[in-house]
């Protein structure tokens, strides 16, 4: 979703005195609609809100959606992400006032989606759960289990869609899962992470890669980097989500197998798992890392990541290190 389109939408809403913004599409369309709704009553440049993260002084226009791509979960979330192509920045913004007033989710609308969009959507919704699941918060048994069950449901039905994009029941499960993944039910009472999203946004901003594809590269690399300090939650993930046998083996071996199975799942869907597949040059890692921390400082919750950490994670996404 790009800023010039948002500006045009704001102009049209003001010109015609519109009272509601209806988004018919996927996450990019819905996020654009939210930005338009935010900008119509705002005095000044709506991009300033994305930079400052300040809550709006005036109520945004109501937003409603007809979902055509289950992925971002924007149809039930209070969040929006916009790309400023001029400054090559991709930033998010959130306000309870941006949660859609209603959303229509009909699985039959997904039958014509290209396979690539299906795969990207699966990666995105899984990442929304990962950002909540991997936490330092203790005594989260119920929400742990809800996260794990939703991840297993997504993977099971993604494999069905991998062979048949017209399976109504599989799409229904995926659409409901994508909704649950990002309406924050799974994040209640948990310190959340959002490091992978912050790092991936720089890939999308600089190289215009698909968000889901970028996450399929960044997420396993991040897991490899932070898991040695947080073995318990990553063993739990490997056993309860990826089906690794929970034996008395060295925890690091269980974790490695869990991450390896996640990468194989991504590749099964045709997603990239290396920076090379995205044609991203290591020479841009320093710039992207600096950009990732430029607004709010170090990223992440489970582990705070500075510029040096982020560059190391980007390097772990390179095949020559990944398969060494």
Task: List PLM regions with ranges.
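Acidic-glycine-rich active-site phosphate/pyrophosphate-binding loop
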Residues: 7-10, 96-103, 151, 189-197
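A glycine/threonine-rich phosphate-anchoring loop and its flanking beta-alpha core
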Residues: 41-139, 236
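N-terminal small/polar loop signature for handling phosphorylated ligands or for N-terminal nucleophile
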Residues: 1-44, 160-171
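C-terminal charged capping/lid subdomain of soluble metabolic enzymes
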Residues: 234, 241, 245-324
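Active-site segments that bind and position negatively charged phosphate/pyrophosphate groups
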Residues: 132, 136-261
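Short glycine-rich or small-residue beta-strand-to-loop segments that form or flank ligand, phosphate
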Residues: 21-24, 64, 181-182
